[in-house]
């Protein structure tokens, strides 16, 4: 049932940006940070970052407000192969307003489906977002 719960639509401009981001040719880390526009009941672009490490990205996320992130990460595998997985990270810090938490939680599935992402992770504190954490999460996807 939770799959059908949609609180906010995805902004059409954001949909197009996510589509282009998916097919980007650059080989550095990059991120799209999104938020819920409560008045418009819509997920919108907040900011875009190029050449940003997980540690730098962590500093850009609010500590007390939820955010959605699509992160293109240069992942060097143990055998030397390089891939560029697109990761969806739901930052849902402890201490957010329940109403805000519900809006984000209810909008997450629609956004993941819209962006066609399979690597979906959640953090409860921005401190969790580190390169070691991301590599550990990605190690489950061979």
From Swiss-Prot:
Q: Which residues carry this modification: N-acetylserine?
A: 2
Q: Which UniProt keywords apply?
A: Acetylation, Growth factor
Database matches in InterPro entries: ADF-H, ADF-H/Gelsolin-like_dom_sf, GMF
- Annotated GO MF terms: actin binding; Arp2/3 complex binding; growth factor activity
One GO term describing the cellular component? cortical actin cytoskeleton
Q: Where is the ADF-H domain?
A: 4-139
| Cited SMART domains | ADF
Q: What Gene3D superfamilies does the record point to?
A: Severin
Top-level lineage group: Eukaryota
GO biological process annotations for this chain's record?
actin filament debranching; negative regulation of Arp2/3 complex-mediated actin nucleation
- UniProt xrefs under Pfam families: Cofilin_ADF
Return the similarity comment: Belongs to the actin-binding proteins ADF family. GMF subfamily.
Could you identify this protein by its name? Glia maturation factor gamma
Q: Which organism is it from?
A: Bos taurus
**What lineage does the source organism belong to?**
Eukaryota, Metazoa, Chordata, Craniata, Vertebrata
């Amino acid at each position: 049932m939770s799959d059908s719960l949609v609180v906010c639509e995805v902004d059409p401009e954001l949909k197009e940006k996510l589509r282009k981001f998916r097919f980007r040719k650059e080989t550095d880390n990059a991120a799209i940070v999104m938020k819920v526009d409560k008045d418009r009941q819509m997920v919108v672009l907040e900011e875009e970052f190029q050449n940003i490490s997980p540690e730098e990205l962590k500093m850009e996320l609010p500590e007390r407000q939820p955010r959605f992130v699509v992160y293109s990460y240069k992942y060097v595998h143990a055998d030397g192969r390089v891939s560029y997985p697109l990761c969806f990270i739901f930052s849902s810090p402890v201490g957010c307003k329940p109403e805000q938490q519900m809006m984000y939680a209810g909008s997450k599935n629609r956004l993941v489906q819209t962006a066609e992402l399979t690597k979906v992770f959640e953090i409860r504190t921005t401190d969790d977002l580190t390169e070691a954490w991301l590599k550990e999460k990605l190690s489950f996807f061979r």
